[in-house]
Amino acid sequence: MTGNYSNEAQAKADAKFDSIVMHMRPIWVDRIDGLWLYVEQSLSATLDKPYRQRVYQIVDGNDANSVEVRIYELPGDLAQYAGAWKKDQPLRQLMPDLLVPRAGCNVTLRLDDSKAWIGSTEPNQCSASSDGASYSMSSVTMTQKEIQSWDRSYDSKGSQVSGSTTGPYIFIKTSR
């Protein structure tokens, strides 16, 4: 899961998709309460201005073929964390108890027969407030070489108000 990812090829082939870069870096590697990752996403044209910054905590799921990805928001001014993925020890100064859990936004991933991890948020559980949205949905498929992520937001009537309407963003791993 850690590494640098880009959907540049997808964006070139289909103008409906913005070109996005995603960085995932391990943080707090000495902790024993799961694998912690700092995740930063930026438009390729504005790499120094990420539009999404999160912390993921990956813990064991209900069985040997599942994990739960707990999603957290960072506290305070997000600009102070921009580019943290470049550091040897990202977010070292931040303590996990300062993170803000995104209630209802956890993703349970299950390992399928093809060795892909597949999962999604629970329907109507992840609250959202931007673009007139009431809730958001995320679907994820991960392999060793790519992450497919389909984030969509809906208003209180169930009409989609943001996110791709045609399918997931396909991020290809560009480096570790």
Question: Where do the PLM segments sit?
Answer:
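Short, solvent-exposed loop/hinge segments that bridge or flank secondary-structure elements
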Residues: 4-32
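Calycin-type beta-barrel ligand-binding domains and close structural analogs
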Residues: 2-8, 45-176
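Short, solvent-exposed loop/turn segments that connect beta-strands within catalytic domains
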Residues: 14-15, 30-33, 65, 157-160
